[in-house]
Amino acid sequence: MSELFAGKYQLKKRLGVGGMAEVWLAELKGPQGFSRQLVIKRILPHLADDDNFITMFEDEARLAARLNHPHAVRVEEFGQAGDVWYLAMEYLDGGDLRHLTRRALTLGENVPIQVLLQMGGDVASALHHAHTLRGAQGQPLNMIHRDVSPHNVLVTTQGQAKLVDFGIARAESNQVKTRTGMVKGKSGYMSPEQALGRT
């Protein structure tokens, strides 16, 4: 069973749900047998009328669309279908780093250190790209992801690491500002500055 969303995306399988949005594997079909898999992230129905959540989602879309890096997930479209806002993003065949390391442990193996170092370098490169982005007038955006964790690092079947989910990222251009002292992210993976509320 699948649902047609936004008049063009066939939702195939729900991949996950969070506090603000749900994520779906989708297929975009076109003429002459064209077909492409994408991921759709859409605001949960009970938040569709919450202006604060919509603005946060718009901030995420704006930030993610600026990223043009081989180790950051690519945003294809930002839109609204009825009263539901959504992002269409590239589909990455693979799994998250958390799943990869747990699977290795289940098999009694470790992920080779060279592989982990390469993935760490890939993610660091994506973070550097995000942090050094500039706005239309050349002003620094000072983007900080704030939720780097194994759950938000996807590893493709070709072994490429990509950083995903800029949902709580902070940037100078955000319309919604985090209150001073408010901490966002997973405590086990926070930088000391983030844990102390300095980002």
Language-model features, listed with the residues they occupy:
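Protein kinase glycine-rich loop
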Residues: 11-18, 23
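AlphaC helix of the eukaryotic protein kinase fold
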Residues: 44-66
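Activation-segment/catalytic-loop signature of the eukaryotic protein kinase fold
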Residues: 78
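Conserved short submotifs of the Hanks-type protein kinase catalytic core
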Residues: 82-96, 100
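AlphaC helix of the protein kinase catalytic domain
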Residues: 97-111
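Protein kinase catalytic-loop region centered on the HRD/HxD motif
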Residues: 124-143
